[in-house]
């Protein structure tokens, strides 16, 4: 609704594009709002419960579930939700939302280089909400909304098999899946060459969608 009020926005060609958690949100927004004319996701979070279960493993997952239940009771007593690290360099001994050391080091590097206000922690309530997150019902609503998903081959953070299941559930025939080799979930945040592999594939699809497949040839001829 806000985007349509902006002079620089073509209200007939509004789309959504997101990476990781916001990649899942792009599916949800497109499924909820028919004014969205296309959607693109990069390594999206698609189903929080199995994602967390896989990431933490059975024993760690049981421990974080216990923390979540304790946190519910604390919030009922009027206490704030407990803060935990988003990721740590020692996930075997320290609880975190995403138990991968390289997630911590990459985001700390981003904080030092370009995002000084980044705080590398979140509430347990946020983890609880993540475990309730499932984009599948919204993916099934994309009957006429063109959609593209780009995933990292073998992604062990957001689980490429879960992502492919969601892609296959999108009923719109105008959809494309790009499985990109030689990149991983976090390298898209830290390696511009890896990001370029994904963004170029999506940019090509988007250009063809909005301007037609001959757009590049016409541009080269000018």
Q: Where in the sequence are the language-model features?
A:
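Catalytic histidine neighborhood in serine/cysteine hydrolases
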Residues: 170-186
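Short beta-strand/loop motif that positions the catalytic acidic residue
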Residues: 142-143, 149-151, 155
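Conserved alpha/beta-hydrolase "acid-adjacent" motif
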Residues: 131, 156-162
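Catalytic histidine-centered segment of alpha/beta-hydrolase-like enzymes
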Residues: 183-196
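Gly/Ala-rich beta-loop-alpha elbow adjacent to hydrolase catalytic centers
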Residues: 18-22, 26
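Alpha/beta-hydrolase-fold enzymes
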Residues: 25-107
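Gly/Ser-rich "nucleophile elbow"/oxyanion-hole loop immediately N-terminal to the catalytic nucleophile
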Residues: 1-15, 78-79, 83
